[in-house]
Amino acid sequence: MPAAGSEPSRPPSPPGVQEQSAEPRPPPPPHGELQYLGQIEHILRCGFRRDDRTGTGTLSVFGMQARYNLRDEFPLLTTKRVFWKGVLEELLWFIKGSTNAKELSSKGVKIWDANGSRDFLDGLGFSDRAEGDLGPVYGFQWRHFGAEYKDMDSEYSGQGVDQLQKVIDTIKTNPNDRRIILCAWNPKDLPLMALPPCHALCQFYVVNGELSCQLYQRSGDMGLGVPFNIASYALLTYMIAHITDLKPGDFVHTLGDAHIYLNHIEPLKTQALMELRGQSSRSLDGDGQAGTSRWAPVATDTERDRCCELQREPRPFPKLKILRKVETIDDFQAEDFQIEGYNPNPTIKMEMAV
């Protein structure tokens, strides 16, 4: 018997068996892509039917936000293959200040071809503009905000405000500034643009040696555009962090009109969720106003919770490596970037609404 007041000795734990911790290890954070898939599901369930500029028709909600971690991963979506070369080449084209769609097309990236076509430009009243000349779109606003736009071949060096360089300089000299903003929305130039900016404004934020970015996107095509935009602004954050000796932090994506084109509904069901089993896939209830209608699945909330399951599980996000030390934003080349571990689900074909 042990002496009064003494504690009986316990035999040592067998090898390999550890004492149970008083504080269990927290579960890993959910996959970042689930935010995007949740947005798709929410629009399919709750979106309003709205007409749009292209005549295609959309399901739309107003106001959404997601936050993507950039520290050890790169948010290139995995539930479908995202056109990484297109993301990279388009961003380099923006940084160059180019407004020539043919320049991008010559690199095999044809995402601006339709908006720069002869028919499209003529339809906007730009019949005197050369084919491929998009007007003062993103790159021009980033590098020459306020300059007078003539055409895609004119020289604009030293004209207007180089917002992108000003962002970089401010991050280096005054990282606590709350005005580190890059804006593509220029009301004076909107009538000259083949397409007004969808991703209109981004703000950068520095804390604890990390650079984060928040994008305000006035119009988000959830099927085609948004996966591209997530990767593009994540890449821009990596690039600016690299040349300012910071580490990437978060990318915060704020959407205004977040919409699914009606001809993208079935492809996105393949990507995001399964149809409600035994139910009509959709029903418009007619309660909308001014030509709008609410998207209303027939199933109850309980049935939706049971029946809506992920059709494609997200896979681990890849990593992005910058292969050499680059000193200025204009020195980046496509060969400087390497995506590692990208193993997405197959491509899902969707037609672009023009």
Curated annotation (Swiss-Prot):
Class in the EC hierarchy, top level: transferase
CDD domains: TS_Pyrimidine_HMase
Superkingdom field: Eukaryota
Residues annotated to bind dUMP: 53, 178-179, 218-221, 229, 259-261
PROSITE patterns registered for this protein in UniProt: THYMIDYLATE_SYNTHASE
Phosphoserine: modified positions: 117
Pathway the protein acts in: Pyrimidine metabolism; dTTP biosynthesis
Keyword Nucleus included in the entry's annotation: yes
GO CC terms of this entry: cytoplasm; cytosol; mitochondrial inner membrane; mitochondrial matrix; mitochondrion; nucleus
Record carries keyword Ubl conjugation: yes
GO annotation terms (biological process): dTMP biosynthetic process; dTTP biosynthetic process; methylation
EC numbers on record: 2.1.1.45
Residues involved in (6R)-5,10-methylene-5,6,7,8-tetrahydrofolate binding: 221, 353
Subcellular location: Nucleus; Cytoplasm; Mitochondrion; Mitochondrion matrix
HAMAP family linked to this entry: Thymidy_synth_bact (MF_00008)
Subunit-level organization: Homodimer.
Protein name, entry field: Thymidylate synthase
Gene name of this polypeptide: TYMS
